[in-house]
Amino acid sequence: MDSHPFGDQRVALKFHEFSDGRKTEHYVKCFANGFSTSVICHEASYGGKKGLYELMLQYHGQPTSADEITAPGDTICGWLTKEEVLEKLERVEKLPPKPKDKLVHEFLNGLVSDQNGFYGEM
């Protein structure tokens, strides 16, 4: 079975189904550089009602941002056409791995955020 260009297809959650019966889509793609993407199109996704896609960027399973993929400080970009998703996937594949000091900061930042119940800076 051929893989979808967006990645491996995942089962979408029932509450994300389109009210008009359209098929909900969810794909996950992992890259050798440690990045991964989750691409969705459903009733509540950014652009989903118009048939457009939302992409979330992750690094070793943690949401992250990267220039030319997401807006600064944002981990999600929406309202993407199929062609725009494919362009972003090509860019993600070419990203260099993150330096370890940045990973430690993001990890610690996540711990503080989780303990305080919000997602802010340390």
PLM regions: where:
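Amphipathic, interaction-prone secondary-structure segments
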Residues: 13-56
